[in-house]
């Protein structure tokens, strides 16, 4: 039997919904003729989601595991009920539905990373083998289903699977940065020392050229030293992204008193909307990659301070995003080495 290419045939509650906003979907692993069955090796849980679960569990890995099993048991997918976000997975193609066989560039045995969110992916976990809180990674035995419309990336052969997965997990951020940033722009990146932040810093620095400026915002001296040593920013400021007035003052001071053309929010905590908006000039752009962003706070906040800025939701997908992101690891030895130290 053939299902809807967007996966609506698996929605249990509420009827008529798409799989991502649905409260519950079917994780029956008998596939429809236009679905793909994946033998799952690991989940890379979205940073905002993992942080929330970890704090709720008091940093106890057994409680984190129990919470993940509870969520998947209730929803049929790994979608954090607080943040609404999911993550991505890595696995091996186990079966391809007859309507897709020979029509896609996948075969049984191929290793892939899914580039659609776990928040819409039917998932069944048989066992949680290990949890790595430092890299938001959960190694499991289980199965998942990719819909006909689902996007994916075959894992590259010139780098380790874990390294590729760490980068692909945030593929939308550097790719959108590549589209948004122009030569001569001044760019403020919040959460610059994190995985997506470092990628965005590198891509922004490349795009602004010698006449532009990239400033990273981090939480501590250790992160500041790391970014400056990497050479992927022009300056680094230390401030809490949850304190917008502090961010405004320190960020403008780092840009010769001038407002920025673009800000990129890669922070994994709530209440950072105004820190992204205040330092930006009228007519500038604010890119919210963070899944902890509130549309209401951003929209009303910008209005409240009279800011006429373009605000972009951090769409995890943009054309060519996997290739752009993996290319950063290939062309930048310092980014690749840093990722290997942090995420392997």
Swiss-Prot record:
<dbReference type="GO" id="GO:0019475">
    <property type="term" value="P:L-lysine catabolic process to acetate"/>
</dbReference>
<keyword id="KW-0520">NAD</keyword>
<comment type="function">
    <text>Involved in the anaerobic fermentation of lysine. Catalyzes the oxidative deamination of L-erythro-3,5-diaminohexanoate (3,5-DAH) to 3-keto-5-aminohexanoate (KAH).</text>
</comment>
<protein>
    <recommendedName>
        <fullName>L-erythro-3,5-diaminohexanoate dehydrogenase</fullName>
        <ecNumber>1.4.1.11</ecNumber>
    </recommendedName>
</protein>
<keyword id="KW-0521">NADP</keyword>
<comment type="similarity">
    <text>Belongs to the KDD family.</text>
</comment>
<comment type="subunit">
    <text>Homodimer.</text>
</comment>
<dbReference type="InterPro" id="IPR036291">
    <property type="entry name" value="NAD(P)-bd_dom_sf"/>
</dbReference>
<dbReference type="GO" id="GO:0047124">
    <property type="term" value="F:L-erythro-3,5-diaminohexanoate dehydrogenase activity"/>
</dbReference>
<comment type="pathway">
    <text>Amino-acid degradation; L-lysine degradation via acetate pathway.</text>
</comment>
<keyword id="KW-0560">Oxidoreductase</keyword>
């Amino acid at each position: 039997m053939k299902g809807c290419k967007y996966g609506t045939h698996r929605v249990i509650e509420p009827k008529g919904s798409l799989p991502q906003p649905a409260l519950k979907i079917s994780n029956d692993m008998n596939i429809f003729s236009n679905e793909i069955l994946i033998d799952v090796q690991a989940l890379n849980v979205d940073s905002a989601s993992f942080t929330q679960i970890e704090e709720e569990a008091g940093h106890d890995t057994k409680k984190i595991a129990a919470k993940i099993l509870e969520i998947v048991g209730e929803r049929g997918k790994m979608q954090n009920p607080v943040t609404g976000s999911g993550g991505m997975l890595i696995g091996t193609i186990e079966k391809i539905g007859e309507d897709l066989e020979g029509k896609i560039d996948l075969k049984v045995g191929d290793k892939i990373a899914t580039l659609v969110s776990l928040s819409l992916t039917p998932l069944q976990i048989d066992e949680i083998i290990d949890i790595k809180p430092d890299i938001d990674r959960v190694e499991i035995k289980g199965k998942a289903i990719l819909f006909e419309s689902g996007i994916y990336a075959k894992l590259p052969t010139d780098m380790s699977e874990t390294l590729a997965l760490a980068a692909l997990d945030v593929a939308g951020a550097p790719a959108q940065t590549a589209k948004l940033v122009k030569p001569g722009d001044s760019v403020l990146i919040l959460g610059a020392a994190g995985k997506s932040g470092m990628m965005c810093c590198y891509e922004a620095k490349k795009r602004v050229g010698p006449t532009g400026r990239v400033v990273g915002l981090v939480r501590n001296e250790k992160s500041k030293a790391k970014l400056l040593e990497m050479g992927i920013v022009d300056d680094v400021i230390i401030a809490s992204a949850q304190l917008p007035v502090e961010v405004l003052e320190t960020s403008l001071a780092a840009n010769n008193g001038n407002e920025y053309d673009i800000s990129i929010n890669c922070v994994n905590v709530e209440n950072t909307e105004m820190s992204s908006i205040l330092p930006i000039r009228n007519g500038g752009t604010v890119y919210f990659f963070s899944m902890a962003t509130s549309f209401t706070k951003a929209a009303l906040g910008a209005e409240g301070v009279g800011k006429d800025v373009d605000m972009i939701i951090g769409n995890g997908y943009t054309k060519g995003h996997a290739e752009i992101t993996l290319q950063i690891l290939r062309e930048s030895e310092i980014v690749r080495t840093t990722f290997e130290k942090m995420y392997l």
